[in-house]
């Protein structure tokens, strides 16, 4: 896949992130361009061996469009988020309190059925936020159907970002979601990214570390 057009979107020296009820932040554009320069495509036929347990960020592309962005900052890193959750058809939500009767109406009608330890019936839908968004939008069954859709319709790219605090990863995610506005991301509503040639006098560049 040719990425040149996407790689050059941050063609200014700096970017400003504006969010409701938050101070404006300024970042060097080169940092984000380096993220794209280091992206690797995940081999869907070898998911568990193809993705590390490091912290990082991942993108789901449909063609050249960024359709979903996520970060991984917990103990199992990208491996835990992508391999064990998003692309694991057995990663399902059986807790009724976490199932939305309206938004999850279709998946609930096609839910995976099983029994709990006491022999009571329970039903499960997608637990992965990424798969849940896809299932709701395209009316796909939980589990194998949403996993197959991800693999068959887009390319998942990722890069590791080590030696960084979780809050900085959150800012990276917020900036990229605000800029690309992926259709499957609903977080960071109201955030705006502005490209700048210079930082205003009196403002400092935030170092992501």
Locations of the language-model features?
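Boundary/linker segments flanking structured domains
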Residues: 1-67, 71-209
């Amino acid at each position: 896949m040719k990425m040149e057009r996407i790689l050059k979107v941050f063609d200014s020296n700096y970017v400003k992130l504006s969010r409701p009820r938050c101070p404006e932040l300024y970042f060097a554009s080169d940092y984000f361009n380096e993220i794209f320069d280091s992206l690797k495509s995940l081999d869907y036929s070898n998911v568990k061996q193809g993705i590390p347990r490091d912290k990082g960020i991942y993108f789901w592309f449909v063609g050249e469009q960024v359709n979903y962005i996520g970060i991984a900052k917990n103990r199992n890193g990208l491996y835990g988020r992508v391999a064990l959750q998003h692309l694991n058809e057995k990663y399902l939500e059986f807790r009724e309190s976490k199932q939305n009767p309206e938004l999850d109406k279709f998946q609930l009608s096609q839910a995976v059925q099983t029994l709990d330890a006491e022999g009571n019936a329970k039903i499960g839908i997608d637990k992965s936020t990424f798969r849940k968004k896809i299932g709701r939008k395209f009316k796909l069954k939980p589990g194998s159907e949403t996993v197959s859709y991800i693999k068959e319709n887009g390319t998942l790219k990722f890069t590791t970002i080590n030696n960084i605090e979780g809050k900085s990863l959150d800012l990276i995610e917020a900036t990229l979601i605000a800029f690309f506005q992926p259709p499957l991301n609903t977080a960071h509503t109201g955030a705006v990214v502005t490209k700048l040639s210079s930082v205003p006098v009196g403002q400092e560049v935030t170092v992501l570390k």
